[in-house]
């Protein structure tokens, strides 16, 4: 029973973060400024399938001649999506699962960091506030900056790691 209660704060964080993920439950994909995310995941998969490691030039852009897309845009977020695609999910669902994992990871790491200073309740509140920050919603659901959004888990993880090193 004690083991179950040790996971309770993390489960509360996940439940409180779920409404931020509601736009991902709609069928298809949502409209945003940079709405080529699924195509980029498709091109990353095509590059990896052709053993272009690390993928730099994607084969389907540039009118079929290829385009050095991943020289200019960081591919980390798409590797997360590729993981889900290799598990058998389609490209659209893999992209949505990529966003879900980014949101949950950033909420979890913010909880770990804030718990050190504010306790469990403060960690939960900080985690939810970090998830619902308006900049994050604009970043994902308006701008479509998934590479930038994939950096959000690392900010509290970095500070938590530095605190733990002391």
Would you name each region that the model predicts?
Residues 13-20, 85, 98-117, 121-166:
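Membrane-embedded helix bundles of polyisoprenyl
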Residues 20-35:
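Helix-to-loop transition at the C-terminal end of transmembrane segments
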Residues 37, 76, 106, 110:
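Hydrophobic (often cysteine-bearing) scaffold residues that line and stabilize catalytic clefts
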């Amino acid at each position: 029973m004690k083991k179950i209660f040790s996971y309770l704060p993390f489960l509360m964080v996940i439940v409180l973060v779920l409404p931020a993920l509601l736009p991902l439950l709609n069928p298809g994909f949502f409209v945003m400024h940079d709405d080529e995310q699924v195509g980029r995941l498709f091109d990353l998969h095509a590059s990896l399938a052709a053993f272009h490691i690390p993928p730099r030039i994607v084969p389907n852009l540039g009118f079929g001649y290829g385009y050095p897309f991943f020289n200019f845009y960081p591919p980390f977020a798409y590797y997360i999506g590729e993981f889900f695609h290799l598990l058998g999910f389609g490209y659209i669902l893999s992209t949505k699962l990529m966003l879900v994992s980014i949101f949950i990871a950033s909420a979890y790491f913010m909880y770990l960091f804030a718990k050190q200073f504010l306790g469990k309740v403060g960690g939960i509140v900080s985690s939810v506030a970090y998830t619902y920050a308006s900049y994050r919603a604009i970043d994902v659901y308006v701008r479509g900056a998934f590479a930038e959004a994939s950096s959000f888990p690392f900010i509290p993880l970095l500070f938590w790691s530095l605190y733990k090193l002391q």
